[in-house]
From Swiss-Prot:
Keywords: Magnesium, Metal-binding, Nucleotide-binding, Nucleotidyltransferase, RNA-binding, Transferase, tRNA processing, tRNA-binding. Its EC number is 2.7.7.-. This is CC-adding tRNA nucleotidyltransferase. Belongs to the tRNA nucleotidyltransferase/poly(A) polymerase family. It catalyses: a tRNA precursor + 2 CTP = a tRNA with a 3' CC end + 2 diphosphate. CTP binds at residues 31-34, 106-107, 111, 148-157, 188. One of its GO terms (molecular function) is nucleotide binding. CDD domains: NT_ClassII-CCAase. GO terms for biological process: tRNA 3'-terminal CCA addition; tRNA surveillance. Mg(2+) binds at residues 46, 48. Its cofactor is Mg(2+). The lineage of its organism: Bacteria, Bacillati, Cyanobacteriota, Cyanophyceae, Synechococcales. It comes from the Bacteria. It comes from Synechocystis sp. (strain ATCC 27184 / PCC 6803 / Kazusa). Pfam families: PolyA_pol, PolyA_pol_RNAbd, tRNA_NucTran2_2.
C-alpha cells in the first residue's frame, strides 16, 4: 500500500549520518524513495544521493566523520560510496544541468522520484508517484532503455519484485529493443536472471520476457513448454512441503541450498543436450557448481523412464551415485517435467535420499581400496574401483554384512 508522502520523513530515522553534512540540494533518489513510498523497509540500506557538485568530497567528509569505509566508484563521473555497518550510501554528481534532467535519464518513472531531506520535499517530474499508486512500471523514455539494454531485463525483474504490471507502451518498446540485450555483459545479465529464477513471482515474468524476445539470445532453446515447467517447479515445491514431514522438509531444503530452486529452473531454460547447455551456462559466466548441478539434472532425467518400472538395485545404485548431492535439484526438475504417473516414484527416490542410513542412497563401505591392496594384495588398478562397487551393491542386496564377508566376496570376484 502506498504511504502518504508525509511518511517520507520517517526516513530520517534511518539516516546513518548527520543530515547537516549534506549540501542543501542533495536528494535521495531511486529505489530507496520508491520503497519508502510503498512502505517497504529494508534491513540493509542501499541508498543513492544526487548532489549538484562535490559528490566525492561529500562522501569523503561523511566517511571521515564516522570512520566508515570510503570508495571512489567512478572518478570521472564523480561517484563515491560510504560503507556503514548496516548499509551503503552512494553519492553521485547529477547528470545534466538540474536534478530534473538527471531524473529524466532514469529507467522507470517509479525510480525517478527524489526526496530532499532538508526541505522535506518530494520531487517527482515524471509522475512516478501516480504509477506507484497504479502498481505500474512505466518507462521514462525509450532512449533511456536503449542506452542501457540491461534495463530491458530489469523491467521484468522489477515488475516481479514490486508485484507491478508493465505499462503496455513500455512493453511494446521492450519487444522492439529486445535484440539489444545481447550487447550487455554476461555477468550483469546473469544477476537479473538469478532474481527471476530464485523468486516464485519471477516465473510469470520469465514467461513474459520469453514472449517478448528478451531471452532469445541467451537461452535460444527455451520454448513455451520449458517456461511452463518453470512455473510447475513452484507447484512442485508446494507438493514437497505437503508430502514431507517437518523434519524431512528441513532436510530437503537444507540439502537443496539457497540457489537450489533457481538451479532447477535454470535447467529448464537451457537446452536438454548437456553439451549445448554447458555452452549456454559458460557464456553467462555461471559458476562450476551451477554448471555441475545442471549437468547432473540433465544427465539424470532420461534415466527415469528406465527406472520407473521395477528397477534393479544395481540401476538405482548407479543412479544415486551419479546424481549424488544434486538429487534434491533433480527431484524439483523431474516433478515439473514428468507425467504425473511418475511422481510417486520420484518421491520414493527422495525418501531414500532423505534417510541418511539408507544404503541405496548413502552406501556405507565395508572396506576401502587400501584394504584390498593390503589384505588381498591386489595391485592398484581400475579393478580396485570395480570391486568396491560390486561390494557396495552386494551389501545393499544383503549378500554380505561385514568386513570379512566383503573381503571374501572380493576374493571370489577376483578369481572370476
Amino acid at each position: 500500500m502506498l504511504c502518504p508522502v508525509s511518511h517520507l520523513a520517517d526516513l530520517r530515522q534511518q539516516v546513518p549520518f548527520d543530515l547537516a553534512l549534506l549540501p542543501p540540494q542533495a536528494c535521495l533518489v531511486g529505489g530507496a524513495v520508491r520503497d519508502a513510498l510503498l512502505g517497504r523497509r529494508r534491513e540493509y540500506l542501499d541508498w543513492d544521493f544526487v548532489v549538484p557538485s562535490g559528490a566525492i568530497e561529500t562522501a569523503s567528509a561523511i566517511a571521515s566523520r564516522y570512520r566508515a569505509g570510503f570508495v571512489v566508484l567512478d572518478k570521472a563521473r564523480h561517484i563515491a560510496r560510504v560503507v556503514f555497518a548496516h548499509g551503503t550510501v552512494d553519492f553521485a554528481q547529477q547528470e545534466g544541468m538540474s536534478l530534473e534532467q538527471d531524473l529524466a535519464r532514469r529507467d522507470f518513472t517509479v525510480n525517478a522520484i527524489a526526496y530532499n531531506f532538508q526541505q522535506n520535499k518530494l520531487i517527482d517530474p515524471m509522475a512516478g508517484v501516480g504509477d506507484l499508486q497504479r502498481g505500474q512500471l512505466k518507462m521514462v523514455a525509450a532512449v533511456n532503455l536503449a542506452d542501457d539494454p540491461l534495463r530491458l531485463l530489469r523491467a521484468y525483474r522489477q515488475a516481479a519484485q514490486l508485484q507491478f504490471t508493465l505499462d503496455p507502451d513500455t512493453r511494446t518498446v521492450l519487444r522492439e529493443l529486445a535484440p539489444r540485450i545481447k550487447t550487455v555483459a554476461a555477468e550483469r545479465v546473469q544477476a537479473e536472471f538469478n532474481y527471476l529464477l530464485g523468486s516464485p513471482r519471477g516465473s510469470q515474468w520469465l514467461l513474459a520476457a520469453w514472449q517478448d524476445g528478451i531471452l532469445a539470445h541467451w537461452f535460444s532453446h527455451a520454448n513455451l513448454s520449458s517456461l511452463n515447467a518453470i512455473g510447475c517447479i513452484d507447484l512442485a515445491i508446494a507438493a514437497i512441503k505437503n508430502q514431507l514431514t517437518l523434519v524431512e522438509r528441513q532436510q530437503f531444503f537444507q540439502a537443496l541450498g539457497k540457489k537450489g530452486i533457481a538451479i532447477a529452473k535454470l535447467a529448464s531454460l537451457v537446452c536438454a543436450d548437456v553439451k549445448i547447455a554447458e555452452g549456454e551456462l559458460q557464456r553467462l559466466k555461471y559458476s562450476r557448481h551451477e554448471l555441475r548441478s545442471v549437468q547432473a539434472i540433465l544427465q539424470g532425467y532420461p534415466q527415469l523412464s528406465c527406472l520407473e518400472n521395477s528397477p534393479t538395485v544395481r540401476q538405482l545404485y548407479f543412479f544415486f551415485v551419479e546424481l549424488g548431492k544434486y538429487l534434491p535439484h533433480f527431484v524439483l526438475y523431474a516433478l515439473a517435467h514428468c507425467p504425473h504417473n511418475y511422481h510417486s516414484f520420484i518421491f520414493e527416490l527422495l525418501t531414500h535420499y532423505l534417510n541418511s542410513g539408507d544404503r541405496l542412497a548413502h552406501p556405507q563401505p565395508l572396506i576401502t581400496g587400501k584394504d584390498l591392496i593390503d589384505k588381498l594384495h591386489i595391485k592398484p588398478s581400475p579393478l580396485i574401483g570395480q570391486l568396491l562397487t560390486e561390494i557396495n551393491i552386494a551389501h545393499i542386496e544383503g549378500k554380505i554384512s561385514n568386513e570379512q564377508e566383503a573381503l571374501a566376496y572380493a576374493q571370489e570376484l577376483g578369481k572370476s
